[in-house]
Every structure is written in structure tokens, then in C-alpha cells.
Amino acid sequence: MSLPTPSVQLYTLVEEFRADAARSLDRLAAIGLRHVEAFDFVGRPAEIRAALDASGLTAPTGHAPLLSDELWTPDGSIPTPEPEAVLEAAAIIGLTTVIDPFVEPVRWSTVDGVNEIADRLNAVADLAATYGLSVGYHNHAQEFLIDIDGRSALEHVVARTDERVAIELDLFWALTGGQDVPALVRRLGSRLLAVHVKDGFVPAENPFGVDADRTVTRHLDQRRPGEGEVPLVEAMRATDAVRWAVIEYDQSPGDVFDDIAASYAFLLEKGLAA
């Protein structure tokens, strides 16, 4: 059984990375990491690639919007770049898979909306192939608002999309969406390219419901792995398909680099990554 390779989503240290990308990457390398997951890279791909090369790190995966004309953030909606611009930047950095990190809950709340998401994923997979890239989707909790034909909307998208479309399962948000996370991991099977390794105590109500108050996502109770209620060990041992174990904190509970180091140590000590 091959083990996933550790990585870290750069959103975890978004402020530190924006302030000093080179120093941030050097600190990740000092922890022992060799890979990162890129974030907010479209506007400065050459700069990010240079910083990665200097630190000896690579970014095999990255987050960027591919399925939306504008993107929600805690500070308001922002316009998204054209898919071609995203893919060109990804190729410069050296990504192999570009993962869409968020599609608005309202689009996940109807069968037509979910089908449209799947169809756009198929179309962008075709486009990405012309750049030598693949695409994927990363969940929050809105992907579990409705069931279609007896399965979650996320799984409906998996069934409706080409095998080239990968899934990156955020284990914390899947639990927030009411899922039996290890069972979901098993059902996703070979489509599961990566997981976001994230622990904590999930909100009492899904903050990504159509009419939910999303400001609660500014105050999440996230913890180091093994200190929350997410069944990380069971979920990660439920499959051997996962290629990347991506450390992430939406809000780090302490010093961000210490927390990343603790997550990295957890993965190695539990035999969940190598």
C-alpha cells in the first residue's frame, strides 16, 4: 500500500506568504515538507515559481477558480480570471492539477445547478488537457446540502464527470456536511487524488447552507490533528488511492508554523504519509 505524500495548502499561512514568500517557503522546507499546494497564484506565477525553486519545494497541486465568474471570500465577492489565464499560470509554476476550491452554495442546492457544475468540470478538463494539466474539485460543506438519486450532490458530480476529474476531499468540511467521512472516502475510490488534513470541532450548523451566516467561518474551532472530532486516521486508512495529504488550517490555533509542523509529525507518526 503506497502512502500519500505530505503537502501544505499555502492558504494556511496566507498572511505570512504574502508578506515574504521566500522566507515562508524556507520555513516549510525546514519543517521537512517538500511540496506545497498553491493559492492565489494567477497574478504572480513567475515570482512564485522562483521562490519555490529557491526553497527546493514544488507545487504539484493548486487552488484557483475554474467554475465561477466570481468568487465569494469572507471580505466579499471578487471577479475570477478566465480559465485560460489560470491554466497558463499553473503551467508556469509547475502544477499538474488545478483544483477549484469553492462553488457557491446556491448552485449546489438544485439538480440543475449540480449538473451544470459537473458539465463545466468536464469542459475545463478538456481545456486543461491542452496545457498538459488535469483538474479537480475541493469541497466545503455545501456539496452535501441535497441528495440526488440517493447520493450526495458531490458524489453525483463524480458520477457525471470524466475519470480525469479528481476530487480533493476536505475531511473537516465533509464532517461539517454531515458525512460519515471514512465511508465517503471509500465510495470516492480512485477519484480521490488528495485530502485536506484538518481537525477541530465542526460548527453546530452548516455555515455553507444557502441562507447561512458565513461569518461564523471566521471563528472556527480548529485544532491540531488528533485533538478534534474529525476521524482523520480512520478516513485516511480507508483508501490507498490518495496521492497527497495536504495539511491545512482555515484558522491556525497557534503559531502557524508550529501547527503545520505538528500536522506533519502527526502524519508521519501515525503512518498516514511518507
Where are these regions (language model features)?
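N-terminal pre-domain/capping segments
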Residues: 1-93, 268-274
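Short amphipathic alpha-helices and their capping/turn segments at secondary-structure boundaries
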Residues: 45-53, 84-92, 122-125, 180-193, ...
